[in-house]
């Protein structure tokens, strides 16, 4: 069983309001990583992100900061072109205070360009979470294992795979793929079976070798998320 860090996802509009800071402070003991989603901000810029990070840095000693731009292709709001998306991810390396950066994986990516960006982020001491999301279904077990394998070839700190289950076997396949991968690879693994059906993957993440589990602060930012206070309490049971 692995140690699991609880990630709290927030998705502010343009700025970090005092009410949001209060909500974070109220849950501070349950948060190991704060994920700042930025894809909900139309035409978001590095300067806007830097301003938000500055406001969050006041509390940063309590948790690590992860920045994520989730594209529409993988279930988010982001509508940047692929080049604009990758340029933004690369430029985030210059922002002090960011500890972790999410970069998406697709089967048709430019492998060399992706590797250059990941290496660039790591040179600026950013931990990389390479992720893939399927909000429609859960692929077969061998395909799940193949996706984990392809993502870890970039030598990130974390590989994250989130899929949508339609039955209990889908949940079991995701957990099996994560468990097998965590036993054989060096990087940390995250496996999420979304929706209420897959809640066990969030609460028992560590049992199957997972390193991060994602919750929310009030309003869920993904199917199946529960409040981080409840999530932390559940995770500590395993």
Curated annotation (Swiss-Prot):
The pathway entry for this protein reads as: Metabolic intermediate biosynthesis; chorismate biosynthesis; chorismate from D-erythrose 4-phosphate and phosphoenolpyruvate: step 3/7
Superkingdom of source: Bacteria
Q: Which InterPro entries match?
A: Aldolase_TIM, DHquinase_I, Type-I_3-dehydroquinase
Q: Which UniProt keywords apply?
A: Amino-acid biosynthesis, Aromatic amino acid biosynthesis, Lyase, Schiff base
GO MF annotations, alphabetized: 3-dehydroquinate dehydratase activity
Name the family the entry cites: Belongs to the type-I 3-dehydroquinase family.
What does this chain do?
Answer: Involved in the third step of the chorismate pathway, which leads to the biosynthesis of aromatic amino acids. Catalyzes the cis-dehydration of 3-dehydroquinate (DHQ) and introduces the first double bond of the aromatic ring to yield 3-dehydroshikimate.
| Official protein name in the record | 3-dehydroquinate dehydratase
Organismal lineage? Bacteria, Bacillati, Bacillota, Bacilli, Bacillales
The record's gene field reads aroD
